[in-house]
Amino acid sequence: MDEAVYREMADVQSAHWWYRGRRHILATVIESLKLPKEAAILEAGCGPGGNLPMLAQFGTVSAFEPHDGARDAANAKGAATVLPGTLPDGIPFPQPFALVCAFDVVEHVEDDVGAVRALGAKLAPGGRLLLTVPAHPWLWSEHDVRNHHHRRYSREAFAKVLDAAGLHTDKLTAFNAHLFPIIAGTRLIQNSLGLGARAEEAVPSPAVNSLLEKIFAAEASQVARGGYPTGVSLLAVASAGRPQ
């Protein structure tokens, strides 16, 4: 991603409703996985490290990030060991993990099947892979361009990636469903008018930010228990499947 995108992410990830709401949803899903005590956890492409303190509630966290500035910011949080690394061929940790996470990372990698296969190869026996990606190719916008996405995924396309990577899909659900009509409408209007996506990435006023966070975070129990048929994003939980 561009340097400016990393800086913006570092500036807003602790306060913006989307990051806060997503962390609550992810924490609820992880809690439902019943990981072993002091589980070894890996986050791929951790960026400036906004998820690391949340992950550290569930075990001992390692992470990797290719961008120097983002990696420095992540290490400064003190919640994980963060090393340089890339997907699919540059994971810097030799050991297996009970939980391997990649939150909105796979869409940045040209070889998405190879990336998911490499992450799956780091699973300890009984381990789980937790992934999120942006949904609906028709929602492609300037936001995706600025973030150097290669693609957005339909549910069927993401299921095929997991299968091609040799994994068993335990859960595949949409999320960010409650706000989906508003976000989809905004993206479509922006696209039709040729507008950029900078406004949606800024932190709204405190009242609006709090309201949006509550609406988004309210999905947590439903995502953990079952899921939603459609939304702005997809979440998958997978485990080791057939040998490659």
Q: Which residue stretches match the model-derived regions?
A:
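Short, glycine-/aromatic-enriched active-site segment of Class I SAM-dependent methyltransferases
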Residues: A10-D11, L129-R151, R155-V161
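A C-terminal cap/extension of S-adenosyl-L-methionine-dependent methyltransferases
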Residues: L179-Q244
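Residues lining the SAM
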Residues: F103-V106, T132
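Short aromatic-enriched loop/helix-cap "lid" or pocket-rim segments at secondary-structure transitions
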Residues: N75, S141-V145, I182-T186
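Di-metal (Zn2+ and/or Mg2+/Mn2+) metal-binding site signature of metallo-dependent hydrolases
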Residues: H108-D112
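Conserved S-adenosyl-L-methionine
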Residues: L167-A177
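A short glycine-rich, Lys/Arg-flanked "PGG" loop and its adjoining helix->strand segment in the class I
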Residues: V113-R128
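Conserved N-terminal segment of class I S-adenosyl-L-methionine
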Residues: M1-F103, V113-V116, P206, S210, ...
